């Protein structure tokens, strides 16, 4: 049996994704340096018609200056525990996480397809993996809410 791209159902075929942006200091910046190609172990015909790993896309090949810029931005954001995120009110932090989950859910199909290609999970297992991840984040949010509620309660001890 020979494998051909045409044998892969259209809804599961992929086009390479070019990732030429990176996040530093709350800003998406355009990467102009070298990139690294990301391949699937699933083989499809290459330009010469020979079976080869399938190109999924490219990612920035972050070099020392960009990495140090990211480190400096992280230090600035944290500010020894006095930055925006560590001092943000619980409700605001939870809202950020809930927004992240909703945005992630909007990309479910795309992420599931990439899981299938990148780590060779079948469709059903890829959906389960995605859904488990969402459930874990939601459960963590709920756990944090419960922890915050417990911390806001006062216990009476000895009538006081």
Regions found by a protein language model. Give the residues of each.
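Short, structured beta/alpha segment
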Residues: 1-117
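Glycine-centered structural positions embedded in regular secondary structure
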Residues: 57, 159-160
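Long amphipathic alpha-helix in the N-terminal Rossmann-like dinucleotide-binding domain
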Residues: 65-74, 94-109, 123-150, 154, ...
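Alpha-helical hairpins and coiled-coil heptad-repeat segments
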Residues: 116, 120-124
């Amino acid at each position: 049996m020979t494998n051909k791209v045409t044998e892969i159902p259209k809804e599961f075929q992929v086009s390479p994704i070019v990732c030429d942006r990176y996040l530093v200091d709350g800003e998406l910046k355009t990467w102009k340096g070298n990139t690294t190609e990301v391949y699937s172990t699933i083989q499809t015909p290459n330009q010469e018609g020979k079976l080869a790993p399938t190109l999924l896309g490219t990612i920035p090949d972050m070099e020392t200056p960009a990495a140090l810029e990211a480190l400096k931005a992280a230090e600035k954001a944290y500010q020894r525990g006095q930055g925006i995120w560590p001092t943000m009110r619980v409700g605001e932090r939870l809202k950020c996480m809930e927004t992240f989950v909703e945005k992630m859910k909007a990309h479910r199909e795309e992420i599931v397809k990439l899981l299938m290609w990148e780590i060779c999970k079948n469709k059903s297992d890829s959906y389960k993996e995605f859904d488990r991840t969402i459930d874990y984040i939601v459960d963590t949010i709920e756990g944090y809410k419960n922890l915050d509620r417990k911390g806001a309660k006062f216990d009476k001890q000895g009538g006081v």
